[in-house]
């Protein structure tokens, strides 16, 4: 199961992911991406992705997260990954994206 929440504070928006970001849980979040990736929602300078409660991420979840990060960059936001799980870093290394992901940590 995957849940998400959004919190706005001063100049920062924090997106919290809870549970499992995987092929089997990704579809509902992917369908709702317009809600949390729209320019009107991301009206702050800094966008943080808090992954402290992310229990599992697979390659499909990693690909989706990379797409979400790229979309935030397109909106000229400062993007940060907070508490990235070891699985995410392992997947980044596996796909040759360690340096790219490191820009967000």
Curated annotation (Swiss-Prot):
Q: What region holds the STAS domain?
A: 4-105
Gene3D superfamilies recorded for this chain? STAS domain
Question: Which PROSITE patterns does its entry note?
Answer: STAS
Segments crossing the lipid bilayer: none
Q: What is its main location?
A: cytoplasm
Superkingdom as given in the UniProt entry: Bacteria
UniProt entry keywords in alphabetical sequence? Cytoplasm, Transport
Q: Which CDD domains match?
A: STAS_anti-anti-sigma_factors
Question: What biological processes does GO assign it?
Answer: DNA damage response; intermembrane phospholipid transfer
Example of a GO MF term = phospholipid transfer activity
This entry carries the following GO cellular component terms, namely: cytoplasm; phospholipid-translocating ATPase complex
Question: Where located?
Answer: Cytoplasm
Chain's role = Part of the ABC transporter complex MlaFEDB, which is involved in a phospholipid transport pathway that maintains lipid asymmetry in the outer membrane by retrograde trafficking of phospholipids from the outer membrane to the inner membrane. MlaB plays critical roles in both the assembly and activity of the complex. May act by modulating MlaF structure and stability.
Binding partners and assembly:
The complex is composed of two ATP-binding proteins (MlaF), two transmembrane proteins (MlaE), two cytoplasmic solute-binding proteins (MlaB) and six periplasmic solute-binding proteins (MlaD).
Q: What is this protein called?
A: Intermembrane phospholipid transport system binding protein MlaB
